[in-house]
Amino acid sequence: MPRRAASPTPSENEVDIAGALFNNDSDFEDNSSKHHTKKGAVTNSGLDLDFNDLLGNGDDGLPSFNGEGDDDEAFIASLTRSSQRKSSNIQGKSVKKGGGFQAMGLNAHLLRAITRKGFSVPTPIQRKAIPLILERKDVVGMARTGSGKTAAFVIPMIERLKGHSPRVGSRALIMSPSRELALQTLKVVKELGRGTDLKTVLLVGGDSLEEQFGMMASNPDIIIATPGRFLHLKVEMNLSLASIKYVVFDEADRLFEMGFATELTEILHALPPSRQTLLFSATLPSSLVEFARAGLQEPSLVRLDAETKVSPDLESAFFAVKGGEKEGALLHLLHDVIKVPLGPPEGTKEESDELQARKRKREYRPNPKEKPTEYSTIIFTATKHHVEYIANLLKLAGFAVSYVYGSLDQTARLIQVDNFRRGRTHILVVTDVAARGIDMPALANVINYDFPSQPKIFVHRVGRTARAGQRGWAYGLVRQSDVPYLLDLQLFLGRKLIIGHDQKNPSFAADVVVGTLKRDGVDVNIEWVEKALKESADLKALKGVAAKAEKLYMKTRNSASSQSAKRAREVTQSRGWTQLHPLFGEEAAEAQAARDDLLSRINRFKPQETIFELGPKGKSSRNKAAEVVRNMRSRFKERKTTNDEDDEDVDMEDAEGKPDGEETNAFEDFEDEEEEGEAEEAEEAEAKEDPYADDSDSEMEVTVSSSMHTKKKGGPVNFQDPEIFMSYTPRTTSLAEEKAYGVHSGGYSGNSFVEAARDATMDLTNDESAKNFGLPTKSKMRWDKRHSKYVAVANDEDGSKGAKMIRGESGVKIAASFKSGRFDRWRKDNRLGKLPTIGETEKSQLIRNFGAQPGQPRYKHKMEKAPKDADKFRDDYHVRKKRVAEAKEKRIGKYKDGEGSKRELKTATDIRKARAVAEKKREKNARPAKRQKR
């Protein structure tokens, strides 16, 4: 009987039962092809059919037919269940509920790389963003630090590009604001791109331009670059970006700030309009107006963790310090709070370059040192001068320190970060260059030595710790001038402010807790710092430079909100501002309070007698000076201050209101009454003047910056009626949060709507020396005090400041050094003709010569030739003579054995070779050997 044809109408789940009924073309099937399982299920044609359920076996194992004719339905149901069980296993792993990477339709190589990377379940940002990106939509993604944003745009990029294209032209561009972030992105791309032949290049400042010329000539698929160096290569090589299909702006809010305005304007102008654009950052505003220049087309906004902002596993503590005590407070924090051990970490040995060269290359494995420890600490400072000063101070104190800042040499930056990652140092001192996107695996503590001027900078700084479920601590040193920024941060985070011991057992993960450090620990370290400054002239010079840099930093940093500045006075004048931090416990707080009370009593002590009245008492010991002082005291009464009068009033009230035997503390009772009075007045004012009392507490929690102004007697009356006035600022949204998330409004200077509207005017005529309505025209020149001459104001606005500039393709001014002709010289030196353009087939010669991936060995010639001898009859005689002298000094080429080209003493090998050469010459000339004379 021939096999029956498959049914043309598939079942609901597209399961063909004919394949299960007839496995072979013959009716006689060998029983050996069936594999019996333990429970009676027979595996046939790759499907597991449970015949016990199918036949309805009873407890005795015998089939029980019910005679109702539903055997076919039971068979089909069993077949469907087995098919579903088989399809649920992909790549050997079951699909997680809610959708895993397997459910996103990724290819097998990429799934294998994701598994090797250690990802099992996608994070929320990956689950939301990857499907949208695979649909080729523009996406703006925001999630807190450490949530897997890099993999969220790398995975769909690899899925879309799939493999290397022989057609010339890069297809993906990833822009990063810093070199370290670009290096980390390259690492993720290489790990997730295993199994593909995609070519990736890294273009950052500090590396050789010639090597990067070769990388770009080898036709890479993916470019990871910083804006400055990429624009330099684009202008120098006259690159075309028409083939770019996938553009990612990592840490987009930092990229679109004014620092990269010129570079991004030129790059965005060269990108094709049909590209897919992605923006990712941990701090993004809800409005996309500020990213209009990115050319987004109907973007999808994925904004997660906007309420949490920082990791829930992060605990924070803020310490009130004085300006001159920051160094001592930092040392006290490291010695007594974090308890960082002195000297290099245990088990780390410095390997020599020779041992590292002989070291066999192996596959990278996570270093056990690259795990968060209780000692690994990163310290953020304001400028690079602070980095150098603090790093040298900590090294002098005995700590193992690494340091990184923006202008540090690229190789030095890599070495310093690698030492910290591998556990060779416990402390890393950095500027904000390391605040964004860099994954520091061995990091448990963050110290804000200089308090951040923007709340979103704080979010990026503390995001270096408490990642991947690990606990972490963030410490901050707060001076009196930093209190407004602390209050802005408190409004942005939406947390409760606890000062001193206002609340018992505060939550360091959910509140903003402020207090002081232990006085005795800080004083000891301050004395040590003063001694070190006296003994080390270099350290003293570094401190002077850091002080000058701090003055400039204070002038240029963003200003805090006016409401926070007003609240700062109340906060610093409160009693809790000088209390010990709750982190040290109640016993230490009581001891500190007793110590402060004793010191305050000693400070307020005034002797009853003057120095003129000292001496033996009695009639026999009369002193004219003492008599004069006594007469003056009896004639003039002591003037009482307002504080003394208040204290007396409080003492009188307490004496009247309490029984005789009870002790009183006038100072504490006075402060308690004052606080109660202020609280009652604040409640009454809030009840009278709050027009939004019906709104929820969560919505009004952080609207302090937009509160109504209180009416003052004799002042101008506010014309705004809260019932009918419609403001341009939203009522229920957090203004503090939106201002902090803003790209150009991270600070509070110049970001009001009125100022922006005033600057948005359009002038149609500007022929005369003045504008309409008598407004003066902005001067085009200004006086430069340093050079004592007038300079153009336009140079200050575009950043040129008198330097040579050229116009780019978009019309903006760029540095003339971007077009220096180095690429033409490089092409001439390598004997390369015209390079292939976009769309042409790549040349195999370029791939062989310059196609090595970053990190792979490049084969270069190492032969060194000595220059030719100087010729007196040539014009370049003196130049050649100088080059020959340099070659002799460096022992290059034929001068490698010394001043002359020959050794003074010949070895046996040299003598044997010389005899062989002489014998060859004799045979060639066919001359008989000379006879020796007798």
UniProtKB/Swiss-Prot annotation:
<keyword id="KW-0378">Hydrolase</keyword>
<keyword id="KW-0698">rRNA processing</keyword>
<feature type="binding site">
    <location>
        <begin position="143"/>
        <end position="150"/>
    </location>
    <ligand>
        <name>ATP</name>
    </ligand>
</feature>
<dbReference type="InterPro" id="IPR012541">
    <property type="entry name" value="DBP10_C"/>
</dbReference>
<dbReference type="Pfam" id="PF08147">
    <property type="entry name" value="DBP10CT"/>
</dbReference>
<dbReference type="InterPro" id="IPR050079">
    <property type="entry name" value="DEAD_box_RNA_helicase"/>
</dbReference>
<dbReference type="Pfam" id="PF00270">
    <property type="entry name" value="DEAD"/>
</dbReference>
<feature type="short sequence motif" description="DEAD box">
    <location>
        <begin position="250"/>
        <end position="253"/>
    </location>
</feature>
<dbReference type="InterPro" id="IPR027417">
    <property type="entry name" value="P-loop_NTPase"/>
</dbReference>
<dbReference type="GO" id="GO:0005524">
    <property type="term" value="F:ATP binding"/>
</dbReference>
<dbReference type="GO" id="GO:0003723">
    <property type="term" value="F:RNA binding"/>
</dbReference>
<dbReference type="InterPro" id="IPR011545">
    <property type="entry name" value="DEAD/DEAH_box_helicase_dom"/>
</dbReference>
<keyword id="KW-0547">Nucleotide-binding</keyword>
<keyword id="KW-0694">RNA-binding</keyword>
<dbReference type="GO" id="GO:0003724">
    <property type="term" value="F:RNA helicase activity"/>
</dbReference>
<dbReference type="InterPro" id="IPR001650">
    <property type="entry name" value="Helicase_C-like"/>
</dbReference>
<protein>
    <recommendedName>
        <fullName>ATP-dependent RNA helicase dbp-10</fullName>
        <ecNumber>3.6.4.13</ecNumber>
    </recommendedName>
</protein>
<feature type="region of interest" description="Disordered">
    <location>
        <begin position="613"/>
        <end position="722"/>
    </location>
</feature>
<feature type="compositionally biased region" description="Acidic residues">
    <location>
        <begin position="662"/>
        <end position="700"/>
    </location>
</feature>
<dbReference type="GO" id="GO:0006364">
    <property type="term" value="P:rRNA processing"/>
</dbReference>
<feature type="compositionally biased region" description="Acidic residues">
    <location>
        <begin position="644"/>
        <end position="654"/>
    </location>
</feature>
<keyword id="KW-0067">ATP-binding</keyword>
<dbReference type="GO" id="GO:0005730">
    <property type="term" value="C:nucleolus"/>
</dbReference>
<feature type="region of interest" description="Disordered">
    <location>
        <begin position="851"/>
        <end position="934"/>
    </location>
</feature>
<dbReference type="InterPro" id="IPR014001">
    <property type="entry name" value="Helicase_ATP-bd"/>
</dbReference>
<feature type="domain" description="Helicase ATP-binding">
    <location>
        <begin position="130"/>
        <end position="302"/>
    </location>
</feature>
<comment type="similarity">
    <text>Belongs to the DEAD box helicase family. DDX54/DBP10 subfamily.</text>
</comment>
<feature type="compositionally biased region" description="Basic and acidic residues">
    <location>
        <begin position="864"/>
        <end position="926"/>
    </location>
</feature>
<keyword id="KW-0539">Nucleus</keyword>
<keyword id="KW-0347">Helicase</keyword>
<feature type="short sequence motif" description="Q motif">
    <location>
        <begin position="99"/>
        <end position="127"/>
    </location>
</feature>
<feature type="region of interest" description="Disordered">
    <location>
        <begin position="343"/>
        <end position="370"/>
    </location>
</feature>
<feature type="region of interest" description="Disordered">
    <location>
        <begin position="21"/>
        <end position="43"/>
    </location>
</feature>
<dbReference type="InterPro" id="IPR014014">
    <property type="entry name" value="RNA_helicase_DEAD_Q_motif"/>
</dbReference>
<dbReference type="InterPro" id="IPR000629">
    <property type="entry name" value="RNA-helicase_DEAD-box_CS"/>
</dbReference>
<dbReference type="InterPro" id="IPR033517">
    <property type="entry name" value="DDX54/DBP10_DEAD-box_helicase"/>
</dbReference>
<comment type="function">
    <text>ATP-binding RNA helicase involved in the biogenesis of 60S ribosomal subunits and is required for the normal formation of 25S and 5.8S rRNAs.</text>
</comment>
<dbReference type="GO" id="GO:0016887">
    <property type="term" value="F:ATP hydrolysis activity"/>
</dbReference>
<keyword id="KW-0690">Ribosome biogenesis</keyword>
<feature type="domain" description="Helicase C-terminal">
    <location>
        <begin position="359"/>
        <end position="513"/>
    </location>
</feature>
<dbReference type="Pfam" id="PF00271">
    <property type="entry name" value="Helicase_C"/>
</dbReference>
